[in-house]
Each structure stands twice: as C-alpha cells, then as structure tokens.
Amino acid sequence: MSQEMPSIDHFNQMNFDEKAWHVWHKATFLIVRNSRNYRVNLYYLNGFYIQLWYHITRNKIDRISATESPRVVDTFLKMIELDLDGIMNSN
C-alpha cells in the first residue's frame, strides 16, 4: 500500500480496501453522526473530507466516499449544541 498522501482524484479511484487503509492509517477523525441504520464517520485527509458509512445492524462498512466540498460538514455541525449561557456564567 502506498504511503503517500493521495489526492482526492486518486482516492476516489481506489478500491474499497485501499480507501479503508488510508482512512485507518492516514486520515484524521473529526466527528460521527447517526443516519437511520448508519453511523457516518467524517474524516479529513490531504485537503478533502471522507465519509465512512457503517451499517449498524449488518456490522459492515457499506461506503467510503470523498469530497472537497466543506458543505459535507454542515450535516455534522447541526448536531452540535452549545450552552453559551452556561459557558459564560461558569465563572
């Protein structure tokens, strides 16, 4: 397996096992969200985002997809809730 950081074009041309290897060994985990029967992990690698779709009941990774669009982060950011009043009044 190549140790080089792939471009998004190269990553998208890889087979499933090669994509998984780069996710496990090179990508940075950012956040996870649930979507119906899936747990969707978001990773960052070499200027692009990777979504890993893990099917919970089948215990299987169904899809690994990459995009350069930061809009993919939006669905994950909707999950974050900040209690700004609690933070501001904690002192």
Protein language model features and the residues they cover:
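Polybasic/polar functional segments that serve as interface/processing modules
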Residues: 1-91
